[in-house]
């Protein structure tokens, strides 16, 4: 699905300003529709690198994900943080979500945007289920040391991303510790995202 022209223009103007019109480059759109794993991490990392090689002005990550693997999410976050090209995260189309790992990725982006009718959050680390063992629920406050370590690490990680990008760090930590979620209009009002 194509990004609405109004949003594309707003994102471009946020980063390029007047210099954009002197030497404009392409806007690269990379889409993820599904779980975050090694394949999606490879796709996004390579796409961000190629955008820089091609002289892109902006990379737009169009996200619709229920979350995924921690290691893959962290690879993507590192690529965004190291990117020479501004990266805008856009949760779209309407009805999409950036849950769990998607929330961290959106927080890492230079600019975060959501289409109306989308949501983000529920970023508590959970162990993935197997056919003989269902996925676990978010760890309780009285969980064992390993679960507490995972939650504390995840909370510090997303808080750091929020502080880096000037976004709502308190809500980010709640998304990890309490598995809370927000709709797009609430996320904009609470300064979790930059544009809706």
PLM regions and their residue ranges:
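Bacterial N-terminal signal peptides
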Residues: 8-19
């Amino acid at each position: 699905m194509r990004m609405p022209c109004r949003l594309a223009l707003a994102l471009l103007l946020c980063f390029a300003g007047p210099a954009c019109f002197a030497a404009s480059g392409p806007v690269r759109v990379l889409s993820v529709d599904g779980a975050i794993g090694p394949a999606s991490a490879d796709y996004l990392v390579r796409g961000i690198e190629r955008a820089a090689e091609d002289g892109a002005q902006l990379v737009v990550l169009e996200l619709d994900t229920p979350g995924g693997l921690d290691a893959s999410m962290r690879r993507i976050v590192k690529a965004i943080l190291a990117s020479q090209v501004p990266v805008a995260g856009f949760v779209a189309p309407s009805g999409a979500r950036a849950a769990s790992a998607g929330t961290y990725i959106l927080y890492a982006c230079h600019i975060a945007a959501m289409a109306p009718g989308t949501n983000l959050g529920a970023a508590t680390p959970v162990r993935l289920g197997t056919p003989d063992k269902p996925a676990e629920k978010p760890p309780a406050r009285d969980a064992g040391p390993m679960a507490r370590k995972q939650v504390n690490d995840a909370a510090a990680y997303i808080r750091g991303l929020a502080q880096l990008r000037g976004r709502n760090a308190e809500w980010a930590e709640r998304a990890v510790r309490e598995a809370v979620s927000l709709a797009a209009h609430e996320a904009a009002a609470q300064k979790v995202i930059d544009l809706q």
